[in-house]
Amino acid sequence: MRGGELVALLAGALLVAGYSWAEQGEPRAVAALANADGTRPGLKPITGKRERAAAVRLISKVRVGEPGSMAGYHRERFGKKWTDAAKGVPYAGNGCRTRDDLLARDGTGVRYRRGSDCVVVAMTLADPYTGKKIEWRKREHYRVQVDHVVPLSYGWRMGASRWPQAKRVRIANDPLNLLPVSGAVNEAKGGAGPAEWLPPQRKIRCAYAVRFAQVAVKYDLAVTRADKIAMLRQCR
């Protein structure tokens, strides 16, 4: 039997058995520049000259501003946590919490609670920030957190404090601004911008800067001068 025929036969057997290559843990991440609405999984490193040049052009569009204070900030200013009621963003209104939507988007071998097609109880995550695989179970929920690429507290200081409530709810639940990652790494990031924090995995940093810029441009959100310089540096 030829190699190609064998691969096709094995692939067919897996499909009959109810599996896909993604469920077996194959990489699924796509490039940020090819994922403008955030509905495709993960972050793929940006390595080619053309892609890096496109990344620099995008980051160059981000406005620079001065940060304001944290006065008046609390999480509820951005709506109920993981609400399905955001307007104008993918997945909203599908009956599932935003967190579960994102776990299902980025996880492989996803398993749901019995009787539910929403509540994710197990999956394997290829963590874009560390490059490590995490075998996640809901009983250890803290091991995977959904990161706001542009932290909500950062957004508040950079202008979201003046936004209508509905716009804050959108950025808090927009899949473009959300990545399931290592819980410990997300805790270490906190509300920091790119000048203060970047993913430990160096090869993903340009892609991270692009995703940060995509969110900033979409919501017309300014970043600090230091953050813009740091973002550009990752892709040059």
PLM regions and their residue ranges:
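Compositionally biased, low-hydrophobicity segments enriched in charged and small polar residues
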Residues: G48-R52, C118-V121, L178
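Generic surface-pattern signal
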Residues: S60-P67, F78, T108, Q214-V217, ...
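Secreted/periplasmic proteins that engage bacterial cell-wall peptidoglycan
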Residues: G65-Q145, V149-V150
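Domain-level detector of nuclease and nuclease-like folds
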Residues: V120, P128-R236
